[in-house]
Amino acid sequence: MGNLIAVRKGTGGGPAVVFDAHLDTVFQPGLKIKATVRNGRVHAPGVGDDTRNIEALLATMRALNAANIRTKGDLIFVFTVEEETNFKGVKHFVEENKGKIDHYIALDGGYEGFTYAGIGINWYRHHFIGPGGHTRSRTPPYSASLPLARSISRIYELKVPTSPPSNLNIGMLGGSEVVNAKASDGWFTVDLRSTSNEIIGSLEKQIAAILEEEAKRTGMSMKTEMISTSPAAVIPGHRDSQLVKIAEAVHRALGFDPPITNTGSNNSSVALLAGISSISTGAGPCADAHALTENCEIEPLYLGIKKILLLELALAGLE
């Protein structure tokens, strides 16, 4: 699979606690990356998501060994692959370790606070299929880009709730590969997100109705591909769980007034969907995630490392 796993055995009698930082980034292979330091920040694509958390997790491992600290429970350090887009690495790890994990901490995201639940995320690719042809051909005078454009305009007029937190995005679209051809396949993607599976379902139905109407209006057919689906990850009562209470206490002990939210979107969701108590947090404040201008503050990382170390000791238990 490609996951890298290290187990620091406890002396016994404590929980099995997983700390996860993902190895992949959203950037394509071949991108030339050179980190630069300016005004107390390090700048490089992927430096925040998720390099800073890999660095912090490795630092805590070295610190535990250097101080010869023993914990009652096992500390399992997992560096996962393919977090971006499909959670493939964490799904494999969780599936292989069913019933063996007590707490799962995904290091990915916020610095001052943490998440205890995950949003639902559904990705689709919608296609309008038409006859195509040359610009001057005798096929209908429009290409599949027409119902595509009309649909996108109407979809963006839908009311997307802000409470509970929900999002809609059309990120990709395509059609003919040349200027002088009518598109025979006009397609676009939709990214739906919400902490409510019911809201995602409602938006799905509204979008499906729009697509059907626009396909009928132009005499074309349509099809939908499901690219990826991940339901909202919520464990009833988890806000008051032992893990969340300990995580909040650790943050407050370090001087944070932590925002505690239910809008996670990372490996933590996979653990939650498997019924494992899980949170996600991060080791340092960063900006411009998923952009070439991504950057992180350097100085706060030291406090972030302390936070992760305290979480490890508080959850696994000191011998």
Residue ranges with predicted function:
Residues V18, I76-V78, K223:
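A structural signal for isolated positions on well-ordered beta-strands in alpha/beta enzyme cores
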Residues Y116, G133-R136, A144-E319:
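Metal-dependent amide/peptide-bond hydrolase catalytic core
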Residues I33-G46, I129-G132, A289-H290:
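Glycine/charged-rich beta-loop-alpha catalytic/anionic-binding loops adjacent to active sites
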Residues D24-R38, I101, Y116-H127, I279-S280:
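Acidic-glycine-rich active-site phosphate/pyrophosphate-binding loop
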Residues H127, R136-T139:
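FAD-binding subdomain of flavoenzyme oxidoreductases
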Residues M1-H43:
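Acidic/His- and Gly-rich active-site-bordering loop/insert found
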Residues R41-V42, G46-W123, P161, I170, ...:
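Acidic/histidine-rich catalytic neighborhood of metal-dependent amide-processing enzymes
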